[in-house]
Amino acid sequence: MRNFPLVLAACMAATPALADTFQEVTVTAGKTLFEAECRRCHAVDASDPSYGPPLENVLYRAAGSYEGYDYSIALEASGIVWTPAALRAWMEDNDGFMPGTKMRHVGIEDRTVQDFILAYLGSISPQDNKAIEGE
């Protein structure tokens, strides 16, 4: 028991490193899933041509607002802001979430896959995006 304070201090010192490692792994997994699920239509930035609008800085951006992309009237007029919850609903059932959209149905229903993709999208957005939990 004499070493308990030392062990406790070591555990507390290691916690940020574990959190960083977990976040890095989550973002890396999200990038891989983004490449598999989203990349055939969406690039990360405008320098890489894609069918859909680029998704860099998508978190907290107004839906239908990326300049130069021809959105559906429904999406442009929606007033939606791409919060993590809105992006999750979109990934799960974009046709149900926004009838009249031009995007084909995606149907990413696995919340873990959604979490990983959201972590990746957060990593390529300039805001201080926290871990997405419970949304």
Where are these regions (language model features)?
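Electrostatic cytochrome c docking/interface patches
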Residues: 17-35, 44, 132
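Gly/Gly-Pro-rich "capping" loops immediately C-terminal to redox-active cysteine motifs
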Residues: 27-31, 43-83, 105-107
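Extracytoplasmic
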Residues: 36, 50, 66, 98-100, ...
